[in-house]
Design a protein with these regions (language model features):
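Metal-dependent polysaccharide deacetylase catalytic core of the NodB/CE4 family, i.e.
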Residues: 16-27, 77-80, 99-194, 225-226
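Short, acidic/turn-prone active-site loops that include or flank metal/cofactor-
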Residues: 110-114, 213-217, 231-232
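Membrane-proximal basic amphipathic "stem/tether" segments
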Residues: 1-16, 227-302
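Active-site environment of divalent metal-dependent phosphoester hydrolases
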Residues: 89-91, 153-155, 190-196, 216-219
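C-terminal domain-boundary segment and adjacent tail
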Residues: 38-74, 176-178, 193, 203-223, ...
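N-terminal structural segment of carbohydrate-active enzymes
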Residues: 2-5, 11-63
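Noncatalytic alpha-helical scaffolds and linker/capping helices
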Residues: 85-86
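A short acidic, amphipathic alpha-helical/loop segment
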Residues: 93-97, 196-200
Length: 302
């Protein structure tokens, strides 16, 4: 595991890029805190329609790694993976829009909160409803991929690796047990990670993991640090169709990656502060370094 970043870099016979798009909520109303993470149904419909009109090839998040490694696909058309984090209840509205455009997506699910509320958020957002297990089963049956977003929605870069690993393992086990589907990919809650966090996720048995980085995923990327492009409410359909095609100069991409790494490194000082929604208390570990799950939203399954 020590050289995972070097040994397992994505390789392919020819460079390839995939635009992994990151969404959170598709709704008409939003709080100030969630405004940039909320796209109205009308805007989402416009965006997906524009991608379809531009000839985009819609793929699942679990397919991205194989495509970057050279699995066959038409390289003349943009490759797009729509991802939706957190499984808010309005994901059902997003799924209906996707179906109208014959498009698929991947929903990253924080399993502790399924059928409950988004308790990791603050203020009134903590009352946002999360899709239930029957809702997720319906999405599965409609061709939407369900993937892992951690159990408690904790940050991979602010918690001990043992906590991150057990949290991700439990999430994967619940999804596979309750929905009967293989779960091979993961999205980091809050988007951040570090080397120890990446190793923890790899140790669970995932094939790939997604962050943010505001870049296309490309041949040569670390499979456990695949970037995504955040799509906000101010992005028109035409602009999004342009975004998935644009090729930034390599020096610009390197600068953006360096900026995100620097910001991520600065987050480590938060480990010294009190527990937050991103970082759990040390006493959550038992004597064997495993994460305790009592005393919170949990259905008692694996």
């Amino acid at each position: 595991m020590g050289n995972i970043e070097r040994r397992d870099r994505v390789t392919a016979s020819a460079p390839r890029r995939v635009a992994a798009l990151m969404y959170h909520s598709v709704a008409d109303d939003s709080t100030p805190a969630m405004r940039e993470l909320t796209v109205s149904p009308e805007r989402f419909d416009e965006q997906v329609g524009a991608l379809r009109a531009a000839g985009a090839q819609f793929v699942r998040a679990s397919e991205v790694l194989g495509l970057l490694r050279g699995e066959p696909i038409d390289d003349a058309a943009p490759i797009v993976a729509i991802t939706i984090d957190d499984a808010f209840a309005d994901v059902l509205d997003a799924a209906a829009i996707l179906a109208r455009h014959d498009a698929t997506a991947t929903v990253f699910v924080p399993t502790a909160y399924v059928g409950m509320r988004a308790a990791w958020l603050e203020g009134e957002d903590a009352r946002r409803p999360i899709a239930g297990w029957s809702d997720l089963a319906g999405l599965r049956d409609a061709g939407i991929e369900l993937a892992a977003h951690g159990h408690w929605h904790i940050a991979a870069d602010l918690n001990p690796p043992a906590v991150v690993q057990e949290d991700a393992r439990r999430c994967r086990a619940l999804l596979e047990d309750r929905l009967g589907v293989p779960v091979t990919t993961y999205a980091y809650p809050f988007g951040f990670h570090d080397r120890a966090g990446r190793r923890a996720i790899a140790a669970v048995g995932f094939d790939s993991a997604f962050a943010i980085f505001h870049l296309h995923a490309r041949t040569g990327d670390d499979p456990f640090a695949l970037p995504r492009l955040h799509v906000g409410p101010g992005i028109s359909g035409a602009r999004l169709a342009e975004m998935v095609r644009v090729r930034r100069p390599r020096i610009v991409e390197q600068g953006l990656r360096g900026k995100d790494r620097l910001f991520g490194a600065g987050r480590h000082v938060r480990r010294l502060g009190p527990p937050t929604s991103q970082r759990i208390a040390p006493y959550a570990l038992d004597d064997y370094g495993r994460l305790r799950f009592g005393g919170g939203p949990d259905d008692g399954r694996p």
